[in-house]
Amino acid sequence: MLRAPIKGIRRSSPDQLEPSVGMVDLADRRKLLERRWTLPRAGFPVTAGRTDTMSIEELSARQPTLIDGDVLLPALVIKRSALANNIAVMQAFAKRHGVLLAPHAKTTMAPQLLQQQLDAGAWGVTVANVFQANVARLAGARAILIANEVVGSPDIDWLIRMTRDDATTMMVQVDSPASAMILERRLRLATDGGFLKVLLELGPAGGRTGARDETAITATARAIADADHLRLVGVTTYEGVVAHDREPDSLARIDGYLDWVKATTLRLAEGGFFDGSERLIVSAGGTRYVDRVIERLAPGAWGGHSVDLIVRAGCYITYGHGAGLNDTPFFDAGPFGQLTPLLELWAEVLSVPEPGLAIVGVGKRNVGERAGAIIPLWVLPRGKDPDSDRAPVAASDALTISGLDDQHAYLAHRPGGIRVGDRIGFGLQHPAALDRWRVVPIVDDAYRITDAVATFFA
């Protein structure tokens, strides 16, 4: 039997759900902007002893530039124009296809960036755990999808507190009778008799989490139906473990898997397992296959059932450089625009110890093991007059990174082309590179720092 609509969602028409997204509390946002960061710090100006701390608000007011050489390097920066573009491109794509966008917070863990995505029209925020969910709340999210199982008692207690907030939509995943019963037993101890909305997670054989076969799926659905404090509002999956590129055979495997997800959802619906909303929720979709998800799991009428599709793409906002990760539906310009690389990493040439080799002051500690190759994009030569007007020039194809140590990069170049003190601007091939940085400046196209974001990965 269907119950009340999901909290935190207002219905504007029979065919569309819209978010009820509250803005971040002004006091919390003010605290974030006024928080003082100890200097010296990467990306902040060197203040020659005038102060030992600086806030993001002060940094934005000062507007130093990378060109002036007053900013401590290495520094990761966000291109402001790319940020606005990428948010707009994905939101337009979601709106055109009638899907609800819940960008994954794990990509940036930056409340200020999440708030911009919400302001642009995102339905809510996807997270991996309750810590990330709390960061999403700081961003002002009033619809939060925890794309994971939650089994720890402290975590469940936090969820119980959140479900008492009528303004917040909170959904979690369940993939087994065991995970359902852990939630139910903890909820049973709560005194208010509340309930938690859950999505049954489906998964492929050999994949990650998720119920694999009909027996496991049915057993999990029955366990949720038998629970007094759980309501099954839909299904969820992550198709990204089925394939890892956009070759034709990979896309065929993705399509086949998504067709199975749809058929399984319809079977559960016909069995009367869903409860908690007038419309079924189906959730999937990282950035790489979001177009396939929308085609195979298109929202609307599935037989006699109305379905809303929530896509959880995250890496679109920090779209990377290089061909290795550009195999997304947004690589070529289309009707919704084209994603553009967001992040640049700037560092100085520390040494030219032999012809054709320069050592740059950036390494694995700055980009992480997972960030993959860094790609030389720009060279800012060290001029005779450090205060003269200069602009970065495009890096030659002859500049390549041959290796990374913890704090050093090996830059191959034509002898005589690179000098000690030159600054190099790198692109990052993998978009998940913010986790090594507590504060990341935002720069305009002239590399003037106009703002900064704080990250909360831990």
Task: Tell what function each PLM region has.
Residues 68-80, 143-146, 164-171, 246-255, ...:
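Glycine-rich tight-turn/loop motif centered on a GG-T
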Residues 188, 197, 204-332:
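Active-site loop/helix belt of alpha/beta enzymes
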Residues 23, 354-458:
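C-terminal accessory subdomain/extension
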Residues 102-247:
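Active-site-proximal beta-alpha core segment in soluble small-molecule metabolic enzymes
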